[in-house]
Structures are given as C-alpha cells and as structure tokens.
C-alpha cells in the first residue's frame, strides 16, 4: 500500500530540548567530551578590557572555527549559515533555537584586534596534543616527516622578477670548519675568504601575496604556493609543522621543523623521510644525536649512457677511487661546497676503451666528488638494508601521506584563502589542531564504549530474546528493526541476531 506523508507536522508545536534533538553519536558530542576548552579563558583574559559591553565568548569563537575545519566548510561566511540551520552545531556552541549567531566577520575582527600577535592558536594546538598524549594515543617511536604544497590565493599571472640574496645554510659554519679540517689533513692551504659580495638569485615574486613562492606543479603547471613540512606519529597525530614559501626545498625547511619536534618529543627512535631529505647534513645530525634515519633509495643523477658513481669503488685506506678500468682517481682538493674531488690521469684515460661512458671532458680527466660527510650517507644506506626498515618506510603511505590526503579532501587544505605567511600559519595551526581533535574525540569515544540510547538493549538482551521467540507468535520470522537507523537499516548496536 502506498503511503502519503502528512505535512501538517511542519506547523505543529512540540516540546523538546535541543539536547534531545541531537543524536547521541553525533560528532559534536564526541568533540564536546574530548577536551575542556575552558583553558582558553585564562589565555585570552589579558586581551579583553575590564569594562564596557560584554564580548562574544572567546570559547564560542574557537568552537566556530573548530566546526569550520572539522567539517570542512570552505569559508567562515558559509560556516555561520550552516550553524543557523544546524541543530547539532547550535548545541555544540550552546546557542538556543532562537538565539542570534555571531556575524561571520566577528572572528576576523577578533583576530586582527586581539589574536594576531599572540600564540593563542599554538597553545590550543599544544593543549590538544597534550590531551592526546595523556590518553596514551601518541606513538612516537617512529616519526614521519614530509612536505606538501598548498595553493596560494594569488594570481599566477601577476608577478615581478626580483633579484634576492641567497640565504646561507643553517649548518654553514659547521661545514666550513669541517672543510678546513679536511684540507689540513690532506696538506692543502685553507680556503681564502669569500668576497663580500653575496650570492644572488632571480625569483618570481607575486604582487598579490609576496610571501608565497613560485612552484612548478607538474610539467606544464606553475602556481604560487606555500609548503607545509609536517611531522606525525604512527597514529597520524600531527606533532608539528613548518610553513614556508612554495619554492623552498624540503631539506631547507627541515631544520626548523626538527627543532620544534625535538622540543615536543624527547626520545623518538626512527625518523622516516623521503628522498627530498636525503642530504649529508641531515644524515649527520640525526645519526650523531642517536636517531635512526629511514630513507629510500635515491636514483643517481647521471647522464644516460655514462657510468654511475657507484661504479667507482672508494678505497678508504688509500683515500682514492678505482674506476671500472681499475685506474686510480687520486685526491685533488676539497671545494667550498664540502666535496672532495678525485681526479684521474688524463694521459691514461685518453686511450681508455670506456672513455665515452666515463667522461666527456676535453682533457679526458674524470672527476668524482665525495662529500666530507659522505660516511653518514653510507650509514643511511646500511640502515636501509637492515631488517624491518622497508616495512617502517612503507608506513608513510598510511601516516603522513594519509594526513595530507585527509587534510586536502576533508578539511580544506588544498587551497588557502588567506594571504601572508602569518595568516597561512594560523590557518594550518587551527586545521591540524582540529584534525588532531577529531581523531582524539573519536578514539576517546570508542575507548569509553558504546554511548547511544539503544545500548541498554544489551543489558536486557536475554529478556528480549525470550519475548521474541517464546511469547510473541510469529516473532521468530520478523527481522529486528531500529527506529533510530536511517532508511530502515539494521542497527547492530541494538541487536546481535
């Protein structure tokens, strides 16, 4: 028989509390139970005056942002519109059915006038992470580091070319000391001091967002973007991150991220990273500090048809290289970049049968370079071949890459709607904090057991089964049905038969 809906219910007056209208298993209930946000009052009390009209509750402001990022709402304007019609969102904020929701510009004005130059968002991120750790959900034996690019809110056709000074490497001083030491051991004079004129490079600078960087996204696509180098644990909780322009290499932004992570996590064992971080300086730092760098095989950047560097065997005792034709390449010098140069005898190489596969130089001299910290890179290769390292590295796709995938697909991380490094950092701080909070809320909910109004059925299951099969005629042929389920689906939290 075809049924017809009576739409008079739309105008019926019913007595119900807002709490009754929000499903017991809704995510907002899990968020509310996961962490007490009242600590925000102590963090912002000095940012408000002691007189005048009462402001909007700062905890409510933060909860509005949490709703935006947790549910992946693209803008604050749309977030406010969703809150106006969504009973669960109103319940989470503590707003009644007829209470006016704050204007969409409220958070922006509060950020500009109060929160801009504070560490409030960083403290919220840290507090959530502390709660995760207190619940025992952090697994920091293996830390996974990687970078992703976030498209900037900038027109790729509006830019100007500028000449900038090349930034010095953060380990430049240590490297120069190692170079001088290496040259003295080989009987070479110290390098002359560099000219005072600094090195310069040409860059495309956006006129819309100068803090962003020109990023080559694939072979035919270039955009202005930001880079977020991020560290997470085995359970996908974000430990910390570092935001830079999109044209900054991962190995450059690693150092600030490593400093932050070292302050948060004291005794990690493995640092799992991709080939973008595989440089001698990073390998040296991790190994000397007792960490185990887990990095992949990196294909040698050799011209097609030429011997690879691995085809030249290094003799550590005599400090020389042997070529595929068993000729010796002797030490020549150590350059400013920290590479020892080993050169062959051009007279012997002139008639070598492998010359076309070895070198294309006019004087027939083959030069093989070796970094002064190359020994650490060899240790990284040894670690790569150890038992279990391959399995640890393969966890990247389930951890850090999953963090980026969820962030971009579910929480609006693919694009940034803000301009400037400070605002983008604020956005990512809140985004990662909300991702951690969402996972924390779900995990705590599961750890606490089933919390829904049907859960009491498990207590009375024997009575229910007796009535079903013994006292009600024909009941054994009826399938259990839960009125709270959607579209007549079976609710497994109510019945187990």
For the regions a language model picked out, list residue spans one by one:
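Hydrophobic alpha-helical membrane-insertion signals
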Residues: 1-29
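Anion-binding and metal-coordination hotspots
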Residues: 4, 72-85, 95-497
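Generic alpha-helical segment signature
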Residues: 11, 24, 37, 57, ...
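A general alpha-helix detector
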Residues: 17, 43, 60-66, 106, ...
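Basic, short loop/linker segments at the boundary and entry of helix-turn-helix/winged-helix-like folds
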Residues: 24-66, 71
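A short secondary-structure junction motif
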Residues: 38-42, 86, 90, 410
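Short amphipathic helix-turn modules centered on a small-residue break
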Residues: 42-48, 90-97
């Amino acid at each position: 028989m075809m049924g017809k809906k009576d739409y008079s219910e739309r105008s019926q007056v019913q007595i119900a509390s807002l709490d009754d209208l929000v499903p017991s298993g809704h995510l907002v209930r899990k968020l509310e139970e996961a962490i007490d946000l009242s600590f925000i009052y102590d963090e912002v009390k000095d940012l408000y005056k002691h007189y005048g009209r009462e402001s909007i509750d700062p905890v409510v402001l933060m909860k509005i942002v949490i709703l935006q990022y947790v549910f992946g709402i693209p803008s604050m304007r749309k977030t406010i519109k969703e809150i106006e019609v969504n009973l669960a969102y109103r319940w989470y904020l503590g707003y009644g059915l007829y209470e006016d929701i704050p204007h969409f510009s409220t958070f922006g004005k509060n950020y500009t006038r109060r929160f801009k130059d504070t560490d409030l968002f960083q403290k919220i991120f840290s507090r959530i992470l502390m709660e995760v750790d207190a619940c025992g959900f952090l697994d920091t034996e293996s830390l996974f580091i990687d970078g992703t690019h976030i498209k900037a809110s900038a027109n790729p056709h509006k830019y100007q070319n500028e000449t900038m000074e090349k930034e010095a490497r953060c380990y430049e001083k240590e490297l120069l000391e190692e170079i001088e030491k290496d040259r003295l051991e080989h009987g070479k004079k110290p390098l002359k001091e560099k000219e005072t004129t600094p090195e310069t490079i040409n860059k495309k600078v956006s006129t819309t967002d100068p803090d962003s960087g020109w990023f080559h996204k694939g072979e035919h696509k270039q955009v202005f973007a930001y880079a977020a180098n991020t560290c997470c644990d085995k359970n996908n909780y974000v430990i910390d991150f570092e935001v830079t322009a999109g044209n900054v290499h991962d190995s450059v932004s690693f150092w600030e991220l490593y400093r932050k992570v070292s302050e948060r996590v004291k005794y990690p064992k493995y640092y799992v990273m991709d080939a973008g971080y595989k440089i001698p300086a990073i390998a040296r730092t991790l190994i000397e500090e007792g960490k185990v760098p887990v990095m992949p095989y990196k294909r040698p950047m050799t011209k097609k048809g030429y011997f690879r560097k691995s085809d030249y065997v290094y003799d550590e005792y005599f400090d020389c290289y042997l070529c595929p034709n068993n000729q010796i390449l002797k030490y020549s010098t150590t350059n400013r970049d920290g590479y020892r140069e080993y050169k062959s005898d051009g007279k012997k190489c002139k008639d070598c049968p492998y010359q076309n596969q070895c070198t294309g130089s006019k004087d027939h001299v083959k030069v093989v370079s070796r970094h002064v910290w190359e020994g650490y890179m060899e240790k990284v290769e040894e670690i790569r071949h150890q038992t279990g390292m391959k399995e640890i590295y393969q966890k990247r796709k389930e951890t850090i890459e999953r963090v980026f995938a969820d962030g971009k697909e579910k929480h609006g991380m693919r694009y940034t709607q803000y301009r400037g490094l400070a605002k983008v950092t604020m956005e990512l701080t809140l985004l990662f904090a909300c991702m951690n909070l969402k996972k924390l809320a779900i995990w705590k909910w599961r750890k606490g057991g089933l919390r829904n109004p049907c859960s009491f059925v498990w207590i009375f299951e024997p009575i229910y089964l007796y009535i079903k099969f013994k006292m009600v005629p024909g009941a054994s042929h009826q399938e259990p049905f839960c009125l709270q389920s959607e579209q007549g689906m079976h609710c497994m939290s109510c019945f187990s038969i």
